[in-house]
Every structure is written in C-alpha cells, then in structure tokens.
Amino acid sequence: MVSTHVDIEQAEWTPGIPFYGPAARYDGKDIVQLKVLSDRRAEGGGIAWLAKFSPPRGKLIKIVATALSDEHVFNLEGGRATKSGAPARASGGYTLNPTGQPHSAMIAAETVSLIIYSGEPDQIVSMEVIDVAA
C-alpha cells in the first residue's frame, strides 16, 4: 500500500450534500463543504475529511447524528455553540463519538474541523438551519 498525500491548499471544497443530505445547502449556498482527504472504506478502512460549516448570519446549523463508526473530531477553527450562538467549545478541541453514539452539534460561526471515521461516516438523523435564540 502506498502513502496518500493531499495538498490541503490546492484541494477544492466540494458540496457536503452526498454525506450530510440536502440540508447542506441553504438558500442556494453550500453551508457544509468537504475536502475528502482519504476514503479507504472499500478496503475495510475509514474516511477522513476537512469539513467547513458556514451558517448564515443570525442562524445556526443544528446537526443530530448517530456514529456508524468511531468518529474523531478535531476543531481547527471556530467551534460548537449554544442555542444563543455563544461559543460552547473553541478551536483546538477534540471529541470522540464511539460507534453507536447519538450526538449533536450546534454551529453558529464558520467552523473548520478535521473529521476521521474508522469506518462509515455518521448517519445524519436531522440537519437544519435555525434562528439563534435571543
């Protein structure tokens, strides 16, 4: 097997719809975009990507999912938020959602995360854009 190398700066952001569903586009804009770094699922491995979440001004992205394999999330920029849009976790944080774990995220500011799955990516139960609570 050969090593995989990806020039992150040269890799293009692609729509997140194939993995996150049609709600990854809002008012004609891709609010979830991915740079797939590796996909070894066909060989029994996992998939890794950079994900960029870009909620519209005054809104937040709410995601509810179930981990179909161990999911490692490293927040590189931005982070999770409360319903009021206040930061709950800043960049530099790490989360492990083990296989079978239901979990959720609310994102109120542009966020970039490195997400690594040991197998299949999350099953997205729901994803919606909601108003930031006053």
Where does each model-flagged region fall?
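Short beta-strand segments in beta-sandwich/barrel cores
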Residues: 58-60, 73, 78-82, 94, ...
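A short, N-terminal "cap"/entry segment at the start of jelly-roll beta-barrel domains
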Residues: 1-47, 129-134
